[in-house]
Protein backbone atom coordinates (compact mmCIF):
# COMPACT_ATOMS: atom_id res chain seq x y z
CA UNK A 1 0.00 0.00 0.00
CA UNK A 2 1.25 3.49 -0.70
CA UNK A 3 1.12 6.14 2.00
CA UNK A 4 2.89 8.88 0.05
CA UNK A 5 -0.01 9.83 -2.22
CA UNK A 6 -2.59 9.89 0.56
CA UNK A 7 -0.12 11.64 2.84
CA UNK A 8 0.20 14.44 0.28
CA UNK A 9 -3.59 14.75 0.24
CA UNK A 10 -3.72 14.80 4.03
CA UNK A 11 -1.12 17.52 4.31
CA UNK A 12 -3.04 19.75 1.90
CA UNK A 13 -6.41 19.02 3.52
CA UNK A 14 -4.95 19.98 6.86
CA UNK A 15 -4.06 23.38 5.43
CA UNK A 16 -7.54 23.86 4.03
CA UNK A 17 -9.72 22.61 6.90
CA UNK A 18 -10.20 23.84 10.48
CA UNK A 19 -8.05 21.88 12.91
CA UNK A 20 -10.85 20.10 14.75
CA UNK A 21 -12.74 19.30 11.55
CA UNK A 22 -9.61 17.73 10.07
CA UNK A 23 -8.85 15.78 13.23
CA UNK A 24 -12.42 14.56 13.64
CA UNK A 25 -13.26 13.46 10.10
CA UNK A 26 -10.22 13.18 7.83
CA UNK A 27 -7.34 12.04 10.01
CA UNK A 28 -9.06 8.76 11.11
CA UNK A 29 -9.24 7.57 7.50
CA UNK A 30 -6.90 4.76 6.47
CA UNK A 31 -5.82 4.32 2.87
CA UNK A 32 -4.78 1.49 0.58
CA UNK A 33 -3.72 1.73 -3.06
CA UNK A 34 -4.07 -1.43 -5.16
CA UNK A 35 -4.54 -1.92 -8.91
CA UNK A 36 -4.91 1.82 -9.48
CA UNK A 37 -7.71 2.05 -6.89
CA UNK A 38 -7.34 4.17 -3.77
CA UNK A 39 -9.58 2.80 -1.02
CA UNK A 40 -10.31 4.98 1.99
CA UNK A 41 -11.42 3.09 5.10
CA UNK A 42 -13.68 4.92 7.57
CA UNK A 43 -14.19 3.72 11.17
CA UNK A 44 -17.99 3.66 10.78
CA UNK A 45 -20.78 4.31 8.30
CA UNK A 46 -21.51 7.76 9.69
CA UNK A 47 -17.95 8.98 9.13
CA UNK A 48 -17.90 7.39 5.68
CA UNK A 49 -21.09 9.17 4.60
CA UNK A 50 -19.92 12.46 6.07
CA UNK A 51 -16.53 12.33 4.34
CA UNK A 52 -18.03 11.32 1.01
CA UNK A 53 -20.63 14.08 1.25
CA UNK A 54 -18.36 16.88 2.45
CA UNK A 55 -14.86 16.13 1.18
CA UNK A 56 -15.18 13.99 -1.95
CA UNK A 57 -14.69 16.94 -4.30
CA UNK A 58 -11.64 18.16 -2.39
CA UNK A 59 -10.03 14.72 -2.34
CA UNK A 60 -10.73 14.18 -6.05
CA UNK A 61 -9.28 17.59 -6.86
CA UNK A 62 -6.07 16.80 -4.98
CA UNK A 63 -5.70 13.39 -6.63
CA UNK A 64 -6.09 15.06 -10.01
CA UNK A 65 -3.49 17.64 -9.04
CA UNK A 66 -0.95 15.08 -7.86
CA UNK A 67 -1.56 12.32 -10.43
CA UNK A 68 -2.70 14.14 -13.56
CA UNK A 69 -4.12 11.68 -16.10
CA UNK A 70 -2.97 8.75 -13.93
CA UNK A 71 -5.56 9.50 -11.24
CA UNK A 72 -6.59 6.30 -9.42
CA UNK A 73 -10.16 5.20 -8.89
CA UNK A 74 -11.52 6.23 -5.51
CA UNK A 75 -13.71 4.08 -3.30
CA UNK A 76 -14.85 4.15 0.31
CA UNK A 77 -15.31 1.29 2.75
CA UNK A 78 -16.20 0.88 6.41
CA UNK A 79 -13.53 -0.88 8.45
CA UNK A 80 -9.76 -0.96 8.72
CA UNK A 81 -7.13 -1.33 6.07
CA UNK A 82 -6.31 -5.03 5.77
CA UNK A 83 -2.87 -6.00 6.97
CA UNK A 84 -1.17 -8.40 4.61
CA UNK A 85 2.28 -9.85 4.28
CA UNK A 86 4.50 -7.99 1.87
CA UNK A 87 4.48 -9.45 -1.60
CA UNK A 88 7.80 -10.54 -3.12
CA UNK A 89 9.11 -8.15 -5.68
CA UNK A 90 8.41 -9.34 -9.21
CA UNK A 91 11.31 -10.43 -11.37
CA UNK A 92 12.28 -7.57 -13.63
CA UNK A 93 13.58 -8.11 -17.12
CA UNK A 94 16.14 -5.85 -18.80
CA UNK A 95 13.27 -4.54 -20.90
CA UNK A 96 11.43 -3.46 -17.74
CA UNK A 97 14.47 -1.58 -16.52
CA UNK A 98 14.95 0.10 -19.88
CA UNK A 99 11.29 1.08 -20.04
CA UNK A 100 11.43 2.64 -16.59
CA UNK A 101 14.60 4.59 -17.33
CA UNK A 102 13.11 6.00 -20.52
CA UNK A 103 9.81 7.06 -18.92
CA UNK A 104 9.25 10.83 -18.60
CA UNK A 105 10.71 12.25 -15.40
CA UNK A 106 7.38 13.86 -14.49
CA UNK A 107 5.59 10.49 -14.51
CA UNK A 108 8.37 8.90 -12.48
CA UNK A 109 8.07 11.66 -9.89
CA UNK A 110 4.33 11.14 -9.66
CA UNK A 111 4.60 7.38 -9.29
CA UNK A 112 3.61 6.44 -5.69
CA UNK A 113 6.16 4.80 -3.46
CA UNK A 114 4.72 1.55 -2.05
CA UNK A 115 5.20 1.32 1.70
CA UNK A 116 3.01 0.94 4.73
CA UNK A 117 1.40 3.81 6.64
CA UNK A 118 3.57 3.22 9.70
CA UNK A 119 6.79 3.43 7.71
CA UNK A 120 6.75 7.22 7.99
CA UNK A 121 5.65 8.08 11.57
CA UNK A 122 7.27 11.53 11.58
CA UNK A 123 5.34 12.60 8.50
CA UNK A 124 2.11 11.33 10.01
CA UNK A 125 2.78 13.15 13.28
CA UNK A 126 3.34 16.37 11.36
CA UNK A 127 -0.27 16.41 10.18
CA UNK A 128 -1.92 15.29 13.42
CA UNK A 129 -2.98 18.79 14.37
CA UNK A 130 -2.74 22.39 13.34
CA UNK A 131 -2.00 25.02 15.94
CA UNK A 132 -3.72 28.01 14.25
CA UNK A 133 -1.02 30.23 15.76
CA UNK A 134 0.19 33.33 13.97
CA UNK A 135 3.98 33.01 13.55
CA UNK A 136 4.30 36.81 13.35
CA UNK A 137 3.27 37.28 16.98
CA UNK A 138 6.38 36.76 19.08
CA UNK A 139 7.67 38.07 22.38
CA UNK A 140 10.40 39.89 20.45
CA UNK A 141 7.95 42.24 18.72
CA UNK A 142 5.65 42.81 21.70
CA UNK A 143 6.20 46.32 23.05
CA UNK A 144 6.49 46.24 26.84
CA UNK A 145 5.17 48.99 29.11
CA UNK A 146 3.76 49.48 32.59
CA UNK A 147 0.30 48.59 31.30
CA UNK A 148 1.28 45.08 30.20
CA UNK A 149 4.48 44.38 32.16
CA UNK A 150 3.01 41.79 34.52
CA UNK A 151 1.10 40.02 31.75
CA UNK A 152 4.23 39.77 29.61
CA UNK A 153 6.31 38.43 32.51
CA UNK A 154 3.69 35.80 33.31
CA UNK A 155 3.40 34.79 29.66
CA UNK A 156 7.16 34.31 29.40
CA UNK A 157 7.22 32.14 32.52
CA UNK A 158 4.39 29.98 31.20
CA UNK A 159 6.17 29.51 27.87
CA UNK A 160 9.32 28.38 29.70
CA UNK A 161 7.47 25.99 32.01
CA UNK A 162 4.02 25.15 30.57
CA UNK A 163 1.61 23.38 32.87
CA UNK A 164 3.52 24.33 36.00
CA UNK A 165 4.23 28.07 36.24
CA UNK A 166 0.69 29.50 36.27
CA UNK A 167 -2.17 27.25 35.30
CA UNK A 168 -4.50 28.57 34.13
CA UNK A 169 -3.17 31.96 33.07
CA UNK A 170 -6.07 34.38 32.63
CA UNK A 171 -5.42 37.65 30.77
CA UNK A 172 -8.15 40.28 30.68
CA UNK A 173 -8.55 43.80 29.35
CA UNK A 174 -10.23 45.85 26.66
CA UNK A 175 -10.19 45.27 22.93
CA UNK A 176 -6.95 45.78 21.02
CA UNK A 177 -4.56 45.84 23.98
CA UNK A 178 -2.36 42.89 22.97
CA UNK A 179 -3.98 39.90 24.69
CA UNK A 180 -4.18 37.92 21.46
CA UNK A 181 -0.58 38.81 20.61
CA UNK A 182 0.53 37.40 23.96
CA UNK A 183 -1.48 34.21 23.41
CA UNK A 184 0.24 33.58 20.10
CA UNK A 185 3.63 34.55 21.54
CA UNK A 186 3.28 31.98 24.32
CA UNK A 187 2.20 29.28 21.88
CA UNK A 188 5.03 30.03 19.46
CA UNK A 189 7.58 30.03 22.29
CA UNK A 190 6.34 26.68 23.62
CA UNK A 191 6.73 25.13 20.17
CA UNK A 192 10.14 26.77 19.72
CA UNK A 193 11.26 25.15 22.98
CA UNK A 194 9.63 21.82 22.15
CA UNK A 195 8.81 21.26 18.46
CA UNK A 196 6.78 18.16 19.34
CA UNK A 197 4.43 20.08 21.65
CA UNK A 198 0.79 20.06 20.59
CA UNK A 199 -0.39 23.65 21.06
CA UNK A 200 -3.78 24.85 19.86
CA UNK A 201 -5.02 28.45 19.68
CA UNK A 202 -8.64 29.28 18.95
CA UNK A 203 -11.41 31.76 19.57
CA UNK A 204 -14.03 30.57 22.05
CA UNK A 205 -16.70 30.66 19.34
CA UNK A 206 -14.71 28.06 17.41
CA UNK A 207 -14.81 25.75 20.41
CA UNK A 208 -18.59 26.19 20.57
CA UNK A 209 -18.99 25.55 16.84
CA UNK A 210 -16.85 22.42 16.99
CA UNK A 211 -18.81 21.08 19.94
CA UNK A 212 -22.17 21.73 18.29
CA UNK A 213 -21.01 20.00 15.12
CA UNK A 214 -19.74 17.04 17.14
CA UNK A 215 -23.07 16.72 18.93
CA UNK A 216 -25.02 16.92 15.68
CA UNK A 217 -22.88 14.21 14.13
CA UNK A 218 -22.64 11.90 17.13
CA UNK A 219 -18.89 12.48 17.33
CA UNK A 220 -18.56 13.97 20.80
CA UNK A 221 -16.00 11.36 21.88
CA UNK A 222 -13.67 12.39 19.03
CA UNK A 223 -14.19 16.01 20.08
CA UNK A 224 -13.25 15.21 23.67
CA UNK A 225 -10.18 13.23 22.68
CA UNK A 226 -8.91 16.04 20.49
CA UNK A 227 -9.22 18.83 23.03
CA UNK A 228 -7.96 16.77 25.94
CA UNK A 229 -4.87 15.58 24.09
CA UNK A 230 -3.23 18.99 23.64
CA UNK A 231 -0.19 20.14 25.60
CA UNK A 232 -1.44 23.73 25.69
CA UNK A 233 -4.91 25.10 24.94
CA UNK A 234 -5.12 28.84 24.25
CA UNK A 235 -8.66 30.24 24.05
CA UNK A 236 -9.39 33.85 23.16
CA UNK A 237 -12.43 35.85 24.34
CA UNK A 238 -13.78 33.30 26.79
CA UNK A 239 -16.69 35.65 27.56
CA UNK A 240 -18.44 34.32 24.44
CA UNK A 241 -19.25 31.18 26.44
CA UNK A 242 -21.93 33.27 28.16
CA UNK A 243 -25.36 31.57 28.23
CA UNK A 244 -24.08 28.57 26.25
CA UNK A 245 -24.77 25.97 28.92
CA UNK A 246 -23.82 22.85 26.95
CA UNK A 247 -20.53 24.40 25.83
CA UNK A 248 -19.76 25.46 29.38
CA UNK A 249 -20.46 21.94 30.61
CA UNK A 250 -18.08 20.41 28.08
CA UNK A 251 -15.40 23.03 28.67
CA UNK A 252 -15.69 22.46 32.42
CA UNK A 253 -14.74 18.81 31.99
CA UNK A 254 -12.05 19.64 29.41
CA UNK A 255 -10.61 22.22 31.79
CA UNK A 256 -10.46 19.70 34.63
CA UNK A 257 -8.90 17.02 32.44
CA UNK A 258 -6.17 19.36 31.20
CA UNK A 259 -5.31 20.59 34.68
CA UNK A 260 -5.13 17.04 36.00
CA UNK A 261 -2.73 16.22 33.18
CA UNK A 262 -0.57 19.31 33.86
CA UNK A 263 -1.46 20.61 30.41
CA UNK A 264 -1.35 24.40 30.08
CA UNK A 265 -4.50 26.52 29.75
CA UNK A 266 -4.40 30.21 28.82
CA UNK A 267 -7.60 32.22 28.53
CA UNK A 268 -8.39 35.82 27.63
CA UNK A 269 -11.46 37.95 28.25
CA UNK A 270 -12.52 41.56 28.02
CA UNK A 271 -13.33 41.60 31.74
CA UNK A 272 -12.34 40.20 35.12
CA UNK A 273 -13.47 36.56 35.53
CA UNK A 274 -16.05 37.26 38.22
CA UNK A 275 -17.58 40.01 36.08
CA UNK A 276 -18.37 37.69 33.16
CA UNK A 277 -22.13 37.35 33.16
CA UNK A 278 -23.86 34.22 31.89
CA UNK A 279 -20.98 31.92 32.88
CA UNK A 280 -21.36 29.36 35.67
CA UNK A 281 -19.74 30.19 39.00
CA UNK A 282 -17.81 26.91 39.02
CA UNK A 283 -16.10 27.93 35.77
CA UNK A 284 -15.40 31.48 36.93
CA UNK A 285 -13.91 30.05 40.10
CA UNK A 286 -11.59 27.79 38.09
CA UNK A 287 -10.53 30.69 35.89
CA UNK A 288 -8.95 32.19 38.99
CA UNK A 289 -7.09 29.08 40.16
CA UNK A 290 -3.84 30.13 38.54
CA UNK A 291 -2.86 33.73 37.84
CA UNK A 292 -5.20 36.49 36.69
CA UNK A 293 -3.54 39.52 35.08
CA UNK A 294 -5.00 42.75 33.73
CA UNK A 295 -3.75 44.18 30.43
CA UNK A 296 -4.45 47.89 30.60
CA UNK A 297 -4.60 50.58 27.93
CA UNK A 298 -1.03 51.65 27.15
CA UNK A 299 0.23 54.77 28.84
CA UNK A 300 1.66 57.62 26.76
CA UNK A 301 5.26 56.37 26.78
CA UNK A 302 4.22 52.90 25.66
CA UNK A 303 2.00 54.32 22.92
CA UNK A 304 4.96 56.30 21.60
CA UNK A 305 7.17 53.19 21.74
CA UNK A 306 4.55 51.16 19.86
CA UNK A 307 4.36 53.77 17.10
CA UNK A 308 8.14 53.95 16.79
CA UNK A 309 8.40 50.15 16.65
CA UNK A 310 5.69 49.83 13.99
CA UNK A 311 7.24 52.62 11.92
CA UNK A 312 10.59 50.83 12.13
CA UNK A 313 8.92 47.62 10.92
CA UNK A 314 7.68 49.57 7.90
CA UNK A 315 11.18 51.05 7.43
CA UNK A 316 9.72 54.51 7.97
CA UNK A 317 11.43 57.26 9.96
CA UNK A 318 8.97 58.72 12.46
CA UNK A 319 10.14 61.79 14.33
CA UNK A 320 9.71 61.72 18.10
CA UNK A 321 7.44 64.76 18.10
CA UNK A 322 5.18 63.18 15.46
CA UNK A 323 4.89 59.94 17.42
CA UNK A 324 4.12 61.94 20.56
CA UNK A 325 1.46 63.97 18.71
CA UNK A 326 -0.35 60.80 17.56
CA UNK A 327 0.03 58.98 20.89
CA UNK A 328 -1.27 61.94 22.86
CA UNK A 329 -4.49 62.03 20.84
CA UNK A 330 -5.23 58.34 20.28
CA UNK A 331 -5.33 56.58 23.63
CA UNK A 332 -7.83 53.74 23.60
CA UNK A 333 -5.85 50.75 22.32
CA UNK A 334 -2.94 49.44 20.28
CA UNK A 335 -5.11 48.48 17.32
CA UNK A 336 -6.32 52.06 16.93
CA UNK A 337 -2.73 53.32 17.04
CA UNK A 338 -1.60 50.85 14.38
CA UNK A 339 -4.54 51.70 12.15
CA UNK A 340 -3.80 55.40 12.40
CA UNK A 341 -0.12 54.88 11.63
CA UNK A 342 -0.97 52.71 8.63
CA UNK A 343 -3.18 55.49 7.30
CA UNK A 344 -0.43 58.07 7.78
CA UNK A 345 2.14 55.88 6.01
CA UNK A 346 -0.25 55.15 3.13
CA UNK A 347 -0.98 58.86 2.65
CA UNK A 348 2.73 59.65 2.72
CA UNK A 349 3.42 56.99 0.09
CA UNK A 350 0.62 58.24 -2.15
CA UNK A 351 1.55 61.90 -1.94
CA UNK A 352 5.32 61.69 -1.50
CA UNK A 353 5.13 64.21 1.34
CA UNK A 354 7.24 64.00 4.52
CA UNK A 355 5.51 62.88 7.72
CA UNK A 356 5.21 66.00 9.85
CA UNK A 357 2.75 67.01 12.55
CA UNK A 358 0.80 69.12 10.04
CA UNK A 359 0.69 66.18 7.63
CA UNK A 360 -0.55 63.84 10.37
CA UNK A 361 -3.18 66.35 11.46
CA UNK A 362 -4.46 66.43 7.89
CA UNK A 363 -4.27 62.67 7.30
CA UNK A 364 -6.10 61.86 10.54
CA UNK A 365 -8.40 64.86 10.73
CA UNK A 366 -11.64 62.84 10.91
CA UNK A 367 -10.24 60.41 13.47
CA UNK A 368 -8.83 63.19 15.64
CA UNK A 369 -12.04 65.19 15.42
CA UNK A 370 -14.08 62.17 16.47
CA UNK A 371 -11.77 61.45 19.40
CA UNK A 372 -11.96 65.03 20.66
CA UNK A 373 -15.72 64.99 20.29
CA UNK A 374 -16.14 61.72 22.21
CA UNK A 375 -13.85 62.44 25.16
CA UNK A 376 -14.49 65.74 26.89
CA UNK A 377 -14.13 66.78 30.51
CA UNK A 378 -17.90 67.04 30.73
CA UNK A 379 -18.28 63.49 29.42
CA UNK A 380 -15.65 62.24 31.88
CA UNK A 381 -17.44 63.88 34.80
CA UNK A 382 -20.79 62.36 33.83
CA UNK A 383 -19.28 58.90 33.31
CA UNK A 384 -17.40 58.92 36.63
CA UNK A 385 -20.43 60.21 38.53
CA UNK A 386 -22.63 57.50 37.04
CA UNK A 387 -20.01 54.82 37.74
CA UNK A 388 -19.78 55.75 41.44
CA UNK A 389 -23.50 56.58 41.74
CA UNK A 390 -22.95 60.17 42.79
CA UNK A 391 -23.88 63.49 41.19
CA UNK A 392 -21.71 65.59 38.90
CA UNK A 393 -22.34 68.43 41.35
CA UNK A 394 -20.54 66.38 44.00
CA UNK A 395 -17.41 66.27 41.82
CA UNK A 396 -17.49 70.05 41.50
CA UNK A 397 -18.25 70.69 45.16
CA UNK A 398 -15.89 71.29 48.09
CA UNK A 399 -16.86 68.02 49.77
CA UNK A 400 -13.84 66.03 50.96
CA UNK A 401 -15.37 62.74 52.05
CA UNK A 402 -13.63 59.75 50.47
CA UNK A 403 -16.80 58.71 48.65
CA UNK A 404 -16.55 61.96 46.68
CA UNK A 405 -12.86 62.88 46.84
CA UNK A 406 -11.61 59.64 45.32
CA UNK A 407 -13.96 59.74 42.29
CA UNK A 408 -13.01 63.41 41.84
CA UNK A 409 -9.31 62.52 41.77
CA UNK A 410 -10.00 59.72 39.30
CA UNK A 411 -11.95 62.07 37.06
CA UNK A 412 -9.10 64.60 37.11
CA UNK A 413 -6.55 61.91 36.25
CA UNK A 414 -8.75 60.69 33.41
CA UNK A 415 -9.10 64.24 32.10
CA UNK A 416 -5.32 64.59 32.01
CA UNK A 417 -4.95 61.20 30.31
CA UNK A 418 -7.77 61.42 27.79
CA UNK A 419 -7.95 65.08 26.81
CA UNK A 420 -5.54 67.74 25.62
CA UNK A 421 -6.53 70.23 28.31
CA UNK A 422 -3.85 71.77 30.52
CA UNK A 423 -3.81 71.29 34.29
CA UNK A 424 -5.22 74.79 34.94
CA UNK A 425 -8.06 74.14 32.47
CA UNK A 426 -8.87 70.85 34.17
CA UNK A 427 -8.82 72.56 37.57
CA UNK A 428 -11.23 75.24 36.35
CA UNK A 429 -13.61 72.53 35.09
CA UNK A 430 -13.66 70.95 38.56
CA UNK A 431 -15.05 73.88 40.51
CA UNK A 432 -12.20 76.32 39.96
CA UNK A 433 -9.49 74.25 41.63
CA UNK A 434 -5.79 75.11 41.39
CA UNK A 435 -3.57 73.25 38.93
CA UNK A 436 -1.50 71.89 41.84
CA UNK A 437 -4.62 70.13 43.12
CA UNK A 438 -5.01 68.44 39.74
CA UNK A 439 -1.35 67.42 39.72
CA UNK A 440 -1.68 65.95 43.23
CA UNK A 441 -4.79 64.02 42.14
CA UNK A 442 -2.98 62.56 39.12
CA UNK A 443 0.00 61.46 41.20
CA UNK A 444 -2.27 60.01 43.89
CA UNK A 445 -4.24 57.93 41.39
CA UNK A 446 -1.04 56.72 39.74
CA UNK A 447 0.18 55.54 43.16
CA UNK A 448 -3.15 53.89 44.03
CA UNK A 449 -3.24 52.03 40.72
CA UNK A 450 -0.03 50.31 41.83
CA UNK A 451 -1.29 49.56 45.35
CA UNK A 452 -5.04 48.98 45.08
CA UNK A 453 -6.63 46.35 42.86
CA UNK A 454 -10.01 48.10 43.15
CA UNK A 455 -8.68 51.46 41.96
CA UNK A 456 -6.78 49.75 39.16
CA UNK A 457 -9.99 47.99 38.09
CA UNK A 458 -12.07 51.17 38.29
CA UNK A 459 -9.56 53.14 36.25
CA UNK A 460 -9.39 50.46 33.55
CA UNK A 461 -13.17 50.16 33.39
CA UNK A 462 -13.61 53.91 33.05
CA UNK A 463 -10.90 54.15 30.37
CA UNK A 464 -12.62 51.37 28.45
CA UNK A 465 -16.03 53.02 28.76
CA UNK A 466 -14.80 56.45 27.71
CA UNK A 467 -12.71 55.14 24.81
CA UNK A 468 -15.30 52.78 23.34
UniProtKB/Swiss-Prot annotation:
Region (Domain II): 84-131
Region Domain IV, binds dsDNA: start-end pairs: 349-468
SMART domains, alphabetized: AAA (SM00382), Bac_DnaA_C (SM00760)
GO molecular function, one term: ATP binding
InterPro entries, per the entry: AAA+_ATPase (IPR003593), Chromosome_initiator_DnaA (IPR001957), Chromosome_initiator_DnaA-like (IPR020591), Chromosome_initiator_DnaA_CS (IPR018312), DnaA_C (IPR013159), DnaA_dom (IPR013317), DnaA_N_dom (IPR024633), DnaA_N_sf (IPR038454)
Annotated region described as Disordered, given as residue ranges: 80-106
Cited Pfam families: Bac_DnaA, Bac_DnaA_C, DnaA_N, Hda_lid
RNA-binding listed as a keyword: no
Entry keyword DNA damage: no
Domain notes: Domain I is involved in oligomerization and binding regulators, domain II is flexibile and of varying length in different bacteria, domain III forms the AAA+ region, while domain IV binds dsDNA.
Identification of the protein by name: Chromosomal replication initiator protein DnaA
Originating species: Vibrio parahaemolyticus serotype O3:K6 (strain RIMD 2210633)
Amino acid sequence: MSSSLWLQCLQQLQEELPATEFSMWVRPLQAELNDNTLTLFAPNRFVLDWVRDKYLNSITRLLQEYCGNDIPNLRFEVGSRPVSAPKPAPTRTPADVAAESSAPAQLQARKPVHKTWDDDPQAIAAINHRSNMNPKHKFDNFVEGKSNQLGLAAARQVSDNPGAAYNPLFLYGGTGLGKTHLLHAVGNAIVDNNPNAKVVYMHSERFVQDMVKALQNNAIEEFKRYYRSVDALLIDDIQFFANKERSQEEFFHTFNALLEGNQQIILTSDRYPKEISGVEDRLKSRFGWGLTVAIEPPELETRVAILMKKAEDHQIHLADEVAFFIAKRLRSNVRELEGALNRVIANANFTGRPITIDFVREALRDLLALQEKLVTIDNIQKTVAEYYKIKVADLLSKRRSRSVARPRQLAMALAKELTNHSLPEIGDAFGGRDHTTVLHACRKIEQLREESHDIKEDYSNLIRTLSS
